[in-house]
């Protein structure tokens, strides 16, 4: 698929009809003639700059709590991981319903405290925040990877750090 996509990028390839080799013309058009490319690149950079740190910090914090918990850790591990395996179509449907301006759950809850809910997905400033929150829904995969890494650390290392006088949080 990667090589096929690369091949397609050097062609004008209509849905019906013959393809025409155009060389680097598609890339020139994208970089110099299409303002939407730069806008979408900027939005993607903002998304990544906000989402990645939040995802890692939140996943690490939850993994750390589950690593030290005993009683209900299996239940919570499953509860946090389960949303990350939900189908993408189902996830989009659920979050579209939550963010809907007319009948959305979020605006319905805000109406109880007298707040007229905004258009979460229609306002460009709020849409990026709404999408980041919806994307963080699946942080369970990252959390599970970090939890597995924490479980792989031998207990002897923690014991040696404790004997050496290293405080609890600094042991990380």
What feature does the model see in each segment?
Residues 1-172:
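A structural signal for multi-pass alpha-helical bundles of membrane permease subunits
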């Amino acid at each position: 698929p990667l090589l096929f996509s690369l091949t397609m990028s050097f062609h004008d390839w209509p849905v019906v009809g013959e393809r025409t080799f155009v060389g680097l013309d598609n890339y020139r058009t994208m970089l110099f003639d299409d303002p939407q490319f730069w806008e979408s690149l900027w939005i993607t950079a903002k998304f990544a700059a906000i989402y990645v740190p939040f995802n890692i910090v939140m996943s690490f914090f939850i993994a750390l709590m589950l690593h030290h918990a005993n009683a209900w850790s299996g239940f919570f591990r499953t509860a946090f991981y389960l949303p990350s395996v939900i189908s993408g179509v189902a996830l989009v449907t659920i979050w579209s319903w939550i963010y809907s301006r007319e009948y959305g759950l979020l605006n319905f809850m805000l109406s109880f405290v007298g707040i007229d809910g905004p258009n979460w997905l229609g306002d460009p400033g709020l849409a990026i925040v709404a999408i980041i929150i919806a994307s963080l829904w699946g942080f369970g995969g990252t959390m599970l990877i970090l939890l597995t890494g924490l479980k792989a650390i031998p207990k002897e290392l923690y014991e040696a750090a404790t004997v050496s006088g290293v405080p609890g949080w600094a042991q990380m």
